[in-house]
């Protein structure tokens, strides 16, 4: 028996299904929910996207020309932490241990997927390095993250700027038996003196 879905519901479900981790059934549930909302709540939801832009400096999402982090006078502008996405900025900020600024690439190099340097915010990064002492490569430890970090390092090091990479290791509170081989190898390579 075929399921009847009206055109507006199908369109809404199709859009929700584009979100990461949302399958067709969840997308349909979200679409039903959204279509039952009062119109003003739907408009508030839609307007949330309207006020978002990229920070002129770091390319993070913001509601102003220069984000709060870049405009914070207490931040060390001489250290830039390069990340893949705005979600990574949020993760670092939750940790509370970083006092520099960020640069969001909005992706990683991935020749297999057709993502090249021109598709990322690399030109913007290179344009803000004049007074920078250190660039921290905080891309994910995937093939694409490593390739992006190496590519950027080769561009930045000739400028006399220190380029570092996040250490790899074991997550706090985890057991060795659950760590994968690469994590254990990197943890051994990056061990520190007590």
Language-model regions, residue ranges each:
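Cys/His-rich Zn2+-binding cysteine-cluster or related metal-binding knuckle/ribbon modules and their
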Residues: 2-10, 18, 26-89, 193
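Conserved phosphate/pyrophosphate-binding and hydrolysis machinery centered on Walker-type P-loop NTPases
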Residues: 2, 20, 48, 60, ...
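Short glycine-/acidic-enriched loop or helix-start segments at secondary-structure transitions
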Residues: 67, 92, 146-149
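Long C-terminal interaction/binding lobes of large macromolecular proteins
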Residues: 98-99, 126-136, 140-194
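Conserved, well-folded catalytic cores of nucleic-acid-processing
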Residues: 19, 37, 48, 61, ...
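Extended interfacial segments that mediate partner engagement and assembly in macromolecular machines
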Residues: 27, 72-139
């Amino acid at each position: 028996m075929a399921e009847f879905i009206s055109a507006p519901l199908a369109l809404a479900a199709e859009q929700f299904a584009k979100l990461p981790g949302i399958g067709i059934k969840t997308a349909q549930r979200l679409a039903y929910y959204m279509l039952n909302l009062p119109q003003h709540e739907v408009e508030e939801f839609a307007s949330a996207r309207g006020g978002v832009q990229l920070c002129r400096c770091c390319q993070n999402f913001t509601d102003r020309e220069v984000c709060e982090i870049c405009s914070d006078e207490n931040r060390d502008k001489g250290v830039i932490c390069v990340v893949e996405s705005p979600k990574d900025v949020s993760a670092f900020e939750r940790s509370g241990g970083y006092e520099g600024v960020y640069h969001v690439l909005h992706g990683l190099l991935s020749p297999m997927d057709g993502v090249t340097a021109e598709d990322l915010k690399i030109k913007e990064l290179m344009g803000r390095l004049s007074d920078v002492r250190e660039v921290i490569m905080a891309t994910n430890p995937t093939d694409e993250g490593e390739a992006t970090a190496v590519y950027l390092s080769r561009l930045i090091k000739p400028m006399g700027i220190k380029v570092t990479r996040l250490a790899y290791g074991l997550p706090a509170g985890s057991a060795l038996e659950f760590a994968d081989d690469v994590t254990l190898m990197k943890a051994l390579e990056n061990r520190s003196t007590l």
